[in-house]
Amino acid sequence: MSRIGKLPISIPAGVTVTLKDDVVTVKGPKGELSQYVNPAINVAIEDGHVTLTENEKEMIDNPKQKHAFHGLYRSLVHNMVVGVSEGYKKELELVGVGYRASNQGNIIELALGYTHNIFIQLPAEVKVETKSERNKNPLIILESCDKQLLGQVCSKIRSFRKPEPYKGKGIKFVGEVIRRKSGKSAGAK
């Protein structure tokens, strides 16, 4: 039995969890999410809690894989419950001279030192806001109820200019620590 998988998930007020044909659907004030669950995992919804257990009747080639599925699907369902009730938020910081970000609806325009600006069309589920204050690095604030989708979008934006180790220029998460390198040491033999 998975250590993560055996923990019950409490359902907050205003959130409903339903199970139909191995698909768990979670509805809440921030939106609706659904996730397929492998038949090797049983899902029980009772007394304001969701519990996942390994299905003893369902056979999988590798028993360790069943333990892995147990923890995986518990984490996915928990992320869905938190997402539709509270939502997820990530902030990206643009570090570099002349780096700018602006948005119009769900389209972000990035000026990252290339000869052209980069336009990124975001999914409808992700809300975006950009902040540019004088003498501060521009920020891109992304919010969504889907943790996986939010992470993928942030990773895609960050991939256009990853932070480099010498000056730290690039797109980084707020609070992320970039491992720095010293430059060439001139004259050292």
Swiss-Prot record:
Q: Which Pfam families match?
A: Ribosomal_L6
Please explain the role this protein plays, according to its UniProt record: This protein binds to the 23S rRNA, and is important in its secondary structure. It is located near the subunit interface in the base of the L7/L12 stalk, and near the tRNA binding site of the peptidyltransferase center.
UniProtKB keywords = Ribonucleoprotein, Ribosomal protein, RNA-binding, rRNA-binding
Which terms under GO biological process does the entry name? cytoplasmic translation
Q: Which PANTHER family match?
A: 60S/50S RIBOSOMAL PROTEIN L6/L9, LARGE RIBOSOMAL SUBUNIT PROTEIN UL6M
**NCBIfam families assigned:** L6_bact
Give the molecular function GO annotations.
Answer: rRNA binding; structural constituent of ribosome
Matching InterPro entries = Ribosomal_uL6-like, Ribosomal_uL6-like_a/b-dom_sf, Ribosomal_uL6_a/b-dom, Ribosomal_uL6_bac-type, Ribosomal_uL6_CS
Gene3D superfamilies with a match to the protein in the record:
Ribosomal protein L6, alpha-beta domain (3.90.930.12)
| Key word Ribosomal protein present | yes
Name of the protein: Large ribosomal subunit protein uL6
- Please give the HAMAP family that the UniProt record associates with this protein: Ribosomal_uL6_B
Asked whether the UniProt record includes Transport among its keywords, one would answer no
The superkingdom listed in its UniProt entry is Bacteria
The entry sums up its family as follows: Belongs to the universal ribosomal protein uL6 family.
**Listed GO CC annotations:** cytosolic large ribosomal subunit
Quaternary structure note: Part of the 50S ribosomal subunit.
